[in-house]
Amino acid sequence: MAKVRAALDRITDPSVKAVLNEEAYSHIRPVLRESLTNNPYAIAPDAADTLEKYGIATNPFAVKVHSHGAVKSIENTLLERVGFNLPKEPCIFLFLKRSKLRYLRRGPSNKDIFINLAIEPRDLQRYEEDTLVESWTRITTRYAYISDTLHFFTRKMLADLFFHNPALDVLYATLVLPPEALHKHPSIEPDLYTINYNFNGFQYIPGNHGGGSYSHEFKQLEWLKVGHLKSPELSLTFQMIESIGANHLFMITRGIKITPRVRTFTKDSYVLFPQIFHPRNLNPSKPFPKVKAMQLFTYVKSVKNPTERDIYAKIRQLIKTSELSDYHPDEIVHIVNYFVFISKLDSINSYSDILSLPIWSKALLPIKTKITQLWEKLTGARAFNQLLDALQWKTFTYSLEVVDFSTAPSQRDCFMEDERLETDTLEDEVSQNANNNKPTSLQNIEEAVKNNPDLPWAPWLLILQAHNADCTQKQYDPENNLILPIQEINTLPKHQHPDIPTDLLTLLTKLHREPTTVPLDNHRARAYGSDVKNLRIGALLKKQSKDWLASFALKTENIERQVLMSVIHGAGGSGKSHAIQTWMRSLNRRDRHVTIILPTTDLRNDWTTKVPNLEQANFKTFEKALCQPCGKIIVFDDYSKLPQGYIEAFLAINQNVILAILTGDSKQSFHHESNEDAYTATLEPSINTYQPFCRYYLNITHRNKPDLANKLGVYSCSSGTTSFTMSSQALKGMPILSPSIMKKTALGEMGQKSMTYAGCQGLTTKAVQILLDTNTPLCSSNVIYTALSRAVDHIHFINTGPNSTDFWEKLDSTPYLKTFLDCVREERMNEIVAVEEPPAPVPAPTTHFPKVNPTTVIESYVHDLPEKHGREIFSETHGHSNAIQTDNPVVQLFPHQQAKDETLYWATIEARLQCTSSEENLKEFHLKHDIGDILFLNYKQAMNLPQDPIPFNPDLWTLCKQEIENTYLKKSAAALVNAATRQSPDFDSHAIALFLKSQWVKKTEKIGCLKIKAGQTIAAFMQQTVMIYGTMARYMRKFRNQYCPRKIFVNCETTPADFNSFILDEWNFNRTCFSNDFTAFDQSQDGSILQFEVIKAKFHNIPEDIIEGYIQIKTHAKIFLGTLSIMRLSGEGPTFDANTEANIAYTHTKFNIPCDAAQVYAGDDMSIDYVASVKPSFNMIEHLMKLKGKPVFNTQTQGDFAEFCGWTISPKGIIKKPEKMNMSIELQKNINKFHEVKRSYALDHAFAYQLGDELHELYNESEAEHHQLATRSLILAGQATALDILDYGLRDLK
């Protein structure tokens, strides 16, 4: 597309352009006409952009107003989609007005039938009277459509609709349910609709118009997940056809058909931050936009020592003012703390590189790495590893997995209350989900509920009794919250396999652990296979042959398999594996159909003891299980301790497996891969992968006493109390749990039975000792929970850490420990704590923007710069130019054009000047008379000049002459002496002394330019000539200022304060603005512009001899190369005024500019707050003029404002472009001239500085960075007073 656009830009022939425009219009016109059918409304620009994203066009000329027109256009578009899908035969429409037929593209010939029930009063005026019915009538058509009402139905109502109408095969239905409401999040499309959450429900507000809102219950959101609806009489399949914002179109058909497993509503663009602080509620918990998260991450890592205030300012900069209401203050605090933490971690890889090592060091590097990793386990991870762990962001999604539902009367409340559908209390969630999916009769459950009416889990008592749990009493945690023995309930489909033993299936059904089909994650299996093949993980596996390793990896490369699984989650001591072990004890000794895979040898020994009737070959550690044949039923015990990806890889290579039983605890520790190079180290814990396939979490324990279990938030099924003691000494005969491998190994060497906090998972013992040291606060809550839940009767804490305030405060912040330690903490001696002097108060920063690393900003400009001679202009005669100077990369960004640079001088002459003859110039001048007339007439009208010529005023002429002479005499004596030659009467009045202008090129678009461009010439005329025509220009300027309309601002003899006032008073920021980027403005001012100047001078009655002299100078001007073509030269007296007036004349000749459009002009610079159309007459003369303009449009939104004379025109007033300001300051600092210009820079920068927080609405991120750097440089240079100055015409800030 870029090449096509470039090709079109190169077309300059007006006739060709006219043909192209006509052709384009022929395509645009029918599209605009068609868009009015579904979207006839005048839509706000932001909402129109959102609709366009969904493929809905908005006619920019539409004027029809609607309170929520954008949402109406979505409804109409979905109706069109429905009409496209419906057959031409008659159909029945439910809850739809007959007037909507036009959006369905259907008419009376289709003989459609409308059936509407008056459910609420406004339905009586919404639907036509002849379509209203008292009750449902029979549906006699194959197809029907229900409009925006299905979410108010129950599932049974829908099933009955199909059951009682056998002719109905397909039902199309639209729903209005925002998927983000499942999480109580703000609207994901705020330009279309908003959401309120209150009164135990949510209110959908289209177009922010409360009068058109709809109130919903959270229960209604179930419809977004329905995959199949089953009843004893029939089955229905749901498929989502379209989704636009909160509006969704579903197709419902009879029978069980395939429907996509996942429903996607929007792109995943949010992340969840890892929980790195304890307790968990002190971490960011809400999804955060990933783009903003990456911006914050790169910011805190690009700035040296960013402060808390800097990060707050950065977040304020990134979040639009209109979006601030979507964030909670406490969430912002947690996000800031998260980024403060990672900003202090080192992001430089602290491990050895292999490129600089000799061969013997490379051979020893793996050993060194292993030792280093072991040491890190003992002493804590390095800062680099901590940073990587802290950056494990989890993608947040609004997508949903479909769920199958049943409408049987005994199962009407079996909907899954998962983590995405928030409820007020967990007690409500359990009672709603405590349904009849259990192998018991309704009568038994009703009796259980009757006997225990006040227990939220009463319907689950029989399931709990099957686990030998008598949960008829309420228990509470330390915060007095009710502990629920059943949690995390998921409703899942039930599947069977004919080869599963009947007694095992009966057992699983009794426990409500029926198998369900689980798809294997190919990515996890492939990661594990790659790690095994490349010897990154494992011990036994590394000893396998290369062929075996290659074969193993190949088998895990691409898997498409689903396996029946029974996932059993429960607390430690809940009896997760007890029932399985009981069943296995009934098996024949030689039964090889069952294999138990264990993560540790200790756990394997425990199983062989508890199931002695089976041969030991049935019990395998996980690595041996990969190398040996296994049965068709697999039990993965404590599967969270298995390596990530192991289960998927195992099931991929063992195709004979028909059932996998997984037991684990999501609250306990999980496997951690120590090799960071392993792919599996980046995978999610297996417990998170399979938790959605667990029917419920059994939150009970037979191991721990109530006082211990309740402190852990677990329901205890035992009686008695637990003994807690603490001392600095270990007791004999009790295993010790230590937080680090180092302590565990040392204790083992001394003959003491010891395990780590994480490694004790699966252990059950009468008494246990828990070692507390400086590593304890570093342990995760899962690890602490594992350690605390091991003991039956007694826990002894061994405090080997410092007995100081800081140490105890750290332990208090560790989840679970604080509750226990309060019971047993020893009396501490009063400590004398030295009172530190309070730090000196830090003065509040003047700027509201976050700190920026200047090196990073500069680097973005210099890193792509080629070497000096690759950028310079080369001439075979004079060699390379010398515009790139010094070795300073900052200075090299700015070309320095110097008068003594011969190569640049000749390159400038070649690019800027064109020689001809005086005869050709006169011919050009006379041939362009008509165009000059047109230019002047348009200029006259634009500048409101009188109808009759302006009489000549000799006194005013004399005054202007004096002003010119006084200005000239203010030059230094040296400057006057240097110009002595041009003051001589012998100097040829037509001759021009040509010089190259010395200057630093600081235009924003030319900073760091890859190739040096031609410079600018200074044309030195005879001094008398300059004085005469400078007087003429000043004389006409006086009249121009007198007649200038209020809406036109000419930036001549004005101050920035004048310009600022004009912008604040006159400029319209509610529409796109327009600028004209002229090409070769000076060189293109040919005979037509000269004619315009002559006619303008005659209108002001300038004496004829002066006008004739001016024509002679313009047509006979000569340099040492010959006579110049008619053009504008920089050394003329009237250069600025003539350029400005030519700009105004050309702009008003080309464009239809309304009188209420604000306009600013200065030389070749201009801008208008209105996008004007081209006059038809201009197409007739455009080819006769050299002057060409390229339009530039600005939306006048954040980061896209018009620029004029180095100022940015913003809704808050004029401000200097921060990029140019900052880079100019950097240049001046690097050439040691900053002290000369700092005050003038500060006065210009003050316009932006004093806007304060309002700048967040104007600057994008890059501009904000440059603004902060410029502000800091000026303040450090002692210009704070200049930035705060109030009498500079900005505003009254007092």
Swiss-Prot record:
What catalytic reaction does the record list? RNA(n) + a ribonucleoside 5'-triphosphate = RNA(n+1) + diphosphate; ATP + H2O = ADP + phosphate + H(+)
Alphavirus-like MT domain span: 59-224
EC code(s) of this entry = 2.7.7.48, 3.6.4.13
The segment(s) forming the (+)RNA virus helicase ATP-binding domain are 541-698
- Chain positions recorded as ATP binding sites: G570, A571, G572, G573, S574, G575, K576, S577
UniProt-listed GO biological process terms: DNA-templated transcription; mRNA modification; RNA processing; viral RNA genome replication
* Keywords for the protein's UniProt record, in alphabetical order: ATP-binding, Helicase, Hydrolase, Multifunctional enzyme, Nucleotide-binding, Nucleotidyltransferase, RNA-directed RNA polymerase, Transferase, Viral RNA replication
Q: Where is the RdRp catalytic domain?
A: 1071-1178
**The organism's place on the tree of life at top rank:** Viruses
UniProt GO molecular function: ATP binding; ATP hydrolysis activity; mRNA methyltransferase activity; RNA binding; RNA helicase activity; RNA-directed RNA polymerase activity
Q: Where is the (+)RNA virus helicase C-terminal domain?
A: 699-832
The family line of this record is:
Belongs to the potexvirus/carlavirus RNA replication protein family.
Write out the function statement from the record: RNA replication. The central part of this protein possibly functions as an ATP-binding helicase.
Protein name as it appears in the record: RNA replication protein
**High-level lineage:** Viruses, Riboviria, Orthornavirae, Kitrinoviricota, Alsuviricetes
